[in-house]
């Protein structure tokens, strides 16, 4: 029986690991958390990858997201990045209804600095 090849746009563990490696090398984050449907296990084939990148300090979140998206270029991975400073994450991570609360509660930590 013929095996169907994995589509080039498919989310694979290898692509997720490579995205994490690139983000760590570029941003030196405190933590990277996979959240949303992929972390909950209810993702569809067309679901994107939601990643929360927690950095020591973020002066311009939009500029940082643009910078980090550039390092992911070429992976063919549908990624939605959210970048936040460590202090702000700690302030909102225990507030129900926030993305940070959901990421802390349901997310999967892909990377955490020592």
Residue spans of the language-model regions?
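Short beta-strand->loop micro-motif that forms the acidic, two-metal-ion catalytic signature
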Residues: 50-54
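Glycine-rich beta-strand-to-loop/alpha-helix junction loops that act as flexible
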Residues: 35-37
């Amino acid at each position: 029986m013929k095996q169907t090849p994995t589509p080039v746009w498919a989310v694979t563990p290898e692509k997720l690991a490579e995205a994490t490696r690139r983000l760590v090398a570029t941003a030196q984050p405190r933590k990277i958390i996979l959240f949303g449907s992929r972390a909950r296990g209810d993702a569809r084939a067309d679901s994107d990858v939601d990643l929360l990148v927690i950095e020591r300090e973020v002066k311009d979140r939009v500029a940082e997201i643009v910078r980090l998206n550039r390092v992911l270029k070429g992976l063919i991975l549908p990624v939605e990045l959210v970048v936040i400073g460590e202090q702000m994450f700690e302030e909102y991570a225990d507030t129900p209804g926030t993305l940070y609360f959901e990421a802390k509660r349901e997310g999967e930590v892909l990377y955490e600095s020592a």
